[in-house]
Amino acid sequence: MMEVFMNFLDQLDLIIQNKHMLEHTFYVKWSKGELTKEQLQAYAKDYYLHIKAFPKYLSAIHSRCDDLEARKLLLDNLMDEENGYPNHIDLWKQFVFALGVTPEELEAHEPSEAAKAKVATFMRWCTGDSLAAGVAALYSYESQIPRIAREKIRGLTEYFGFSNPEDYAYFTEHEEADVRHAREEKALIEMLLKDDADKVLEASQEVTQSLYGFLDSFLDPGTCCSCHQSY
């Protein structure tokens, strides 16, 4: 049984690796300093919807979970998101403001259809009938973040004039915290998995696709990854 489960986790990780955000053209351009300030601003404002929604994803799973140990792990992640000042939403705002976006601009921003679709995908799986699939949706995202955060910091400091660590503290925080979150989420999938392995893999496929679709929205149609890549 353990070997079968490990093969299942390998399948999950393969789905994520085959559509890793760090390989997306938008993040490749970020790492090379090839994005414009306007592209970074548009991205930062549009990503805000997901940042605000992330604690709700966790709450949706936590509130319906009967396993005490699983709830503790979910609550630990949720507390990381919302506790203290600055919390993760505050840290994201610091990044956005460092790009020259005003608080009024950020709050008045109308999220794109791609941003709404991404959040809707996460929420659908996190509120669905499979708790393991909901956690898999989170794992498919958070397991990628440490590498991405490290590369974002490098790009921001080398090419985009970021010298104050507070301006990219959101990424510094997630470079470390999401290593633990991903490890805990992998354990949670094992704890919560029933006969819903297919849903777990489906959740990962849909989430990784929605993440790519969101990043595509900041590129010219001819360079978007979803237009000419298949996995």
Curated annotation (Swiss-Prot):
Documented effect of changing Y43F: Loss of PABA synthase activity
Family matches, as Gene3D superfamilies: Heme oxygenase-like (1.20.910.10)
Compartment list: Secreted; Host cytoplasm
Cofactor binding annotation: Binds 2 divalent metal cations per subunit. Can use a diiron cofactor for catalysis. However, activity is much higher in vitro in the presence of both iron and manganese, which implicates a heterodinuclear iron/manganese cofactor.
UniProt-reported outcome of changing Y141F: Retains 90% of PABA synthase activity. Retains 80% of PABA synthase activity in the presence of iron and manganese
Example of a GO MF term: toxin activity
Gene Ontology cellular-component annotations: extracellular region; host cell cytoplasm
Cofactor(s) needed: Fe(2+); Mn(2+)
Pfam families on file: TENA_THI-4
InterPro entries: Fol-rel_CADD, Haem_Oase-like_multi-hlx, PqqC-like, Thiaminase-2/PQQC
Quaternary structure annotation from Swiss-Prot or TrEMBL: Homodimer. During infection, interacts with death domains of mammalian tumor necrosis factor (TNF) family receptors Fas, DR4, DR5 and to some extent TNFR1, but not with the respective downstream adapters.
PANTHER family per the UniProt record, alphabetical: 4-AMINOBENZOATE SYNTHASE, PQQC-LIKE PROTEIN
Family to which the UniProt record says this protein belongs: Belongs to the CADD family.
Full protein name: 4-aminobenzoate synthase
Source species of the chain: Chlamydia trachomatis serovar D (strain ATCC VR-885 / DSM 19411 / UW-3/Cx)
